[in-house]
């Protein structure tokens, strides 16, 4: 199994080096994948995640009801607060805070220190998935194609698919066929098989593709019953096209 703390920190370093090298104008560039946010805000969110773990302020209830409107609203308010708290600080200061918070949280993920009681046991995968999502948000905002086959993205894809399994209810599991790997969200005969690229699958599972974009994949059956499963952070109506 991948060392998830190592994968997280490797991705953090990559983002920090990249964002730290940007001009102030590019650090303030809007991020289409995260409407209303800039590159600065994305870094603030990632930093706030670790601060919240250390202070036991992580919204554990969200993971018990993923995608439910009330929980999505709570999560969005929590995220907005952590971003707002860092909005007036220079990016370099936020990156420094992120770096300083990382060792203690990584020790928790490795089992060397106790995690706060409200966190789910798979919080390590949640953090790796989140950092992979936001790394691509940043690259997409700048029109760049980078790190689309990295460990964090692969782990994030399998984590999102596992999350669909937990939310299927009475639906037969969907199967996703990509050139790199096949994923199935549950056991038994699939109710529908979709074929697309792994990067597209990852971005869709993180809510970065519109329903129309997902419908346009090659489906073996009607995709409609499955579309809501792609939006754990709330619906997306506008298409997001990335290079």
Describe the role of every protein-language-model region:
Residues 16-38, 59, 107-119:
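Helix-loop segments that flank and shape redox-cofactor active sites
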Residues 10, 34-45, 126-133, 196:
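Aromatic- and histidine-enriched alpha-helix N-cap/loop-to-helix transition segments
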Residues 1-20:
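Non-cleavable N-terminal signal-anchor transmembrane helices
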Residues 12, 46, 50, 102:
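Short amphipathic alpha-helical/adjacent loop interface patches that line ligand
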Residues 7, 17, 36-55:
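Active-site-proximal cofactor/substrate-binding loop regions of enzyme domains
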Residues 1-3, 51-110:
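Short, helix-capping/interhelical loops that line the mouth of catalytic, cofactor-
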Residues 16, 43, 54, 95, ...:
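Non-transmembrane alpha-helical segments in soluble domains
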Residues 1-4, 29, 58-68, 111-243:
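Structured surface interface patches that mediate subunit assembly and partner/cofactor docking
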């Amino acid at each position: 199994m991948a060392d998830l703390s190592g994968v997280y920190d490797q991705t953090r370093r990559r983002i920090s080096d990249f964002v730290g090298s940007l001009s102030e104008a590019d650090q303030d560039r809007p991020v289409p994948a995260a409407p209303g946010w800039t590159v600065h805000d994305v870094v603030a969110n990632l930093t706030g995640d670790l601060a919240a773990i250390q202070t036991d302020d992580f919204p554990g209830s969200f993971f018990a009801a993923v995608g439910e409107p009330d929980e999505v609203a709570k999560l969005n308010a929590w995220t907005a607060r952590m971003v707002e708290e860092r909005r007036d600080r220079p990016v370099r200061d936020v990156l420094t805070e992120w770096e300083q918070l990382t060792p203690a949280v990584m020790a928790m993920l490795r089992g060397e220190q106790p995690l706060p009681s409200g966190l789910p046991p798979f919080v390590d995968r949640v953090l790796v998935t989140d950092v992979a999502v936001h790394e691509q948000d940043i690259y997409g905002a700048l029109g760049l194609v980078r790190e689309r086959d990295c460990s964090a993205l692969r782990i994030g894809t399998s984590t999102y698919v596992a999350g669909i399994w937990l939310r299927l209810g009475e639906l037969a599991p969907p199967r996703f066929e990509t050139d790199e790997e096949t994923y199935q969200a549950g056991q038994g005969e699939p109710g529908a098989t979709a074929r697309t690229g792994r990067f597209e699958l990852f971005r869709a599972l993180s809510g970065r593709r519109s329903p129309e974009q997902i419908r346009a994949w090659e489906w073996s059956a009607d995709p409609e019953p499955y579309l809501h499963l792609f939006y754990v952070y709330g619906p997306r109506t506008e298409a997001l096209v990335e290079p």
